C-alpha cells in the first residue's frame, strides 16, 4: 500500500506519540505460526523458524509476540485458526504445510503470509509462479527432484518393479507427487501402485492393501502418512516391505532410507524470510530444496 506524504506525516506523529507512551510495545513485533498437524518434520520447521528469529534478535517475551496453533489434522480447524490469526493483525503469519497455507491465504490479502513445507505452491494456488509473487504471500518450498528419489529406490531395492505409495488424495502436495511418479517410474522400468489414506487412521489399512502388490513403499511428506508413520512401519516390517522416505526424520522412525529435506534447516530459511518482513523488506519466494538435502 502506498502512503501519500500527508498521510505519512500523520502516521509518523501517531507512532512517535505511542513510542513516548509505551516504548516497549511500540518496538514489539508479532508472529503467528500455524501447522496443519504436529509431527517431527513440521515441528522441526516451527523450531527452525524460532531459531532464525532468535538469531536475528527477536525473542518471545522481550521484543516478540509469538503465537503457535496446530490444526490437529482438521481443515476446518485450520480455517478457524487462520481467521483468528488474521484478526490478531500480526506482522507476519507463518503457515506450515499446504492445508494450513491454503487456509491462511484464503483468509487475508493484507497480512504478510509466509508458507513453509509446501511442495508445490503453484499447484496449491498459493502463488502464480515461483518468482516474486507481487502479493502478500511468499515462502519456502520443500520440492525435491523426484528423479533422485527414484535413483535411491533403485539403489536400495535394485530388483523393485512395483513401487507403492500411501497418500491423501485430498492433499495437493501428494497429488502432484503421485502424478510425477506416474510419469517418471516407467522410464526406470517400474510402476506405481497407489493406496489412498484420506485420514491418518486410514494409513495402516491403506498400507495393508499393498501387501503382495508392491516390492517397496515410498512415502512423500504427506501429512496424514507422516503423522501416522509408525503404523506404516509396522505393516512394512510384518510384510517385509522396505520403506523409503523423503524426509530424514522418518528413518529414525523406521524407514530404511531417505533422501530428503532437513526440515529444521527449512524452518531456518523460512524464519529468515520472516525476519526480512519484520525489518520492512520486500517479500520474495525461494526454493530451498537444493540447499537442504540430507541422506
What are these regions (language model features)?
Residues 49, 284-295:
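Single conserved hydrophobic/aromatic residue that forms the stacking wall/gate
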Residues 31-50, 56, 67-76, 170-172, ...:
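Extracytoplasmic "Venus flytrap"
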Residues 11-19:
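Bacterial N-terminal signal peptides
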Residues 2-11:
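Bacterial N-terminal signal peptides that target proteins for export
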Residues 121-160, 261-281:
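Hydrophobic alpha-helical segments within soluble ligand-binding/sensing domains
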Residues 166, 172-248:
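Pocket-lining segment of extracytoplasmic ligand-binding domains
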Residues 22-26:
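Sec/Tat signal peptide C-region and signal peptidase I cleavage site
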Residues 66, 70-128, 219-237, 241:
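Beta-alpha junction/loop-to-helix N-cap segments that form part of ligand/metal-binding clefts
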Amino acid at each position: 500500500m502506498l502512503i501519500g506524504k500527508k498521510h505519512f506525516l500523520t502516521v509518523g506523529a501517531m507512532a512517535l506519540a505511542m513510542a513516548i507512551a509505551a516504548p516497549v510495545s511500540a518496538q514489539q513485533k508479532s508472529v503467528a505460526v500455524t501447522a496443519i498437524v504436529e509431527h517431527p518434520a513440521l515441528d522441526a520447521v516451527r523450531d527452525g523458524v524460532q531459531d532464525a528469529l532468535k538469531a536475528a534478535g527477536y525473542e518471545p517475551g522481550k521484543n516478540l509476540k509469538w503465537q503457535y496453533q496446530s490444526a490437529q489434522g482438521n481443515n476446518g480447524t485450520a480455517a478457524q485458526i487462520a481467521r483468528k490469526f488474521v484478526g490478531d493483525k500480526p506482522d507476519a503469519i507463518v503457515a506450515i504445510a499446504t492445508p494450513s497455507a491454503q487456509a491462511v491465504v484464503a483468509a487475508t490479502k493484507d497480512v504478510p503470509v509466509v508458507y513453509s513445507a509446501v511442495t508445490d505452491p503453484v499447484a496449491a494456488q498459493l502463488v502464480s509462479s515461483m518468482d516474486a509473487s507481487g502479493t502478500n504471500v511468499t515462502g519456502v518450498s520443500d520440492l525435491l527432484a523426484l528423479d533422485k528419489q527414484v535413483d535411491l529406490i533403485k539403489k536400495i531395492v535394485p530388483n523393485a518393479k512395483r513401487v507403492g505409495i500411501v497418500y491423501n488424495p485430498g492433499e495437493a502436495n501428494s497429488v502432484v507427487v503421485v502424478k510425477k511418479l506416474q510419469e517418471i517410474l516407467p522410464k526406470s522400468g517400474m510402476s506405481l501402485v497407489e493406496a489412498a489414506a484420506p485420514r491418518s487412521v486410514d494409513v495402516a489399512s491403506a498400507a495393508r492393501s499393498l501387501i503382495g502388490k508392491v516390492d517397496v513403499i515410498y512415502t512423500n511428506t504427506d501429512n496424514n502418512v507422516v503423522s501416522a508413520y509408525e503404523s506404516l512401519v509396522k505393516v512394512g516390517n510384518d510384510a517385509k516391505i522396505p520403506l523409503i522416505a523423503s524426509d530424514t526424520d522418518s528413518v529414525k522412525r523406521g524407514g530404511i532410507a531417505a533422501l530428503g529435506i532437513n526440515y529444521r534447516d527449512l524452518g531456518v530459511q523460512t524464519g529468515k524470510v520472516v525476519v526480512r518482513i519484520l525489518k520492512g523488506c520486500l517479500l520474495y519466494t525461494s526454493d530451498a530444496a537444493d540447499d537442504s538435502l540430507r541422506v
